[in-house]
Amino acid sequence: MENFQKVEKIGEGTYGVVYKAKNKLTGEVVALKKIRLDTETEGVPSTAIREISLLKELNHPNIVKLLDVIHTENKLYLVFEFLHQDLKKFMDASALTGIPLPLIKSYLFQLLQGLAFCHSHRVLHRDLKPQNLLINADGSIKLADFGLARAFGVPVRTYTHEVVTLWYRAPEILLGCKYYSTAVDIWSLGCIFAEMVTRRALFPGDSEIDQLFRIFRTLGTPDEVVWPGVTSMPDYKPSFPKWARQDFSKVVPPLDEDGRSLLSQMLHYDPNKRISAKAALAHPFFQDVTKPVPHLRL
């Protein structure tokens, strides 16, 4: 740790404080995440160390690179490449004008490339949200915190007792499914896609039941026809109100037919029928994809 000089605190992640830091030996600027675990007393679980070490092998231009894992005195520090801004801050800064569609398309395409890569290595994210999608001035966007959920679990609250957001959580997780798949990440990315387009969160729930009901009000309450097996999921209740599905042209008005088609496939209730990242990359929506540069106010 003595090799790093902390420059400033960037923010509070799910698991601990994140600092901008400088490697004293190389001059490289990095993001330093201190992982606060409940098991501080017993030290860091060896399973977590093993999981995290595997992530050093995940090399892809749309994945934030884990440069190093430093394990000292019951504390764990993760050293990541440094990026300028997260998508949440960028969306907030672009709230008046909106993000131009070519940039939205580029971001979605790049994120799907990152997902396809991780999913092909059987690594899930499980907690995708605009805060852990990081952007650079050159038009790149990268997925951060990949694999941390499996190593440390997804807590209900962060170490500072902030509630971990449910807005991007897939319905199978909300309905208590214990065994979920890569499809949970596609759902989250679909919600983020819609948010970039409309400039507001698609399903901003404030509790698990509110989250589910917001999804149901938009996509219709699922039944055995659209989602075989849904009625036997642990948290499914036959007493759920029966809402009808809304037309997607009302849900994401700025999107063209290709965009709506892709979004509806990313938000398919049945995880087995939800489009994969690899298939999404071949969708007609991306036939004219480019890589524009964002106007960053840093």
Swiss-Prot record:
The modification Phosphotyrosine is found at residues 15, 19. The keyword Transport does not apply. The modification Phosphothreonine is found at residues 14, 160. Its cofactor is Mg(2+). Keywords: Acetylation, ATP-binding, Cell cycle, Cell division, Cytoplasm, Cytoskeleton, DNA damage, DNA repair, Endosome, Kinase, Magnesium, Meiosis, Metal-binding, Mitosis, Nucleotide-binding, Nucleus, Phosphoprotein, Serine/threonine-protein kinase, Transferase. Residues 4-286 form the Protein kinase domain. This is Cyclin-dependent kinase 2. It comes from Bos taurus (Bovine). The gene is CDK2.
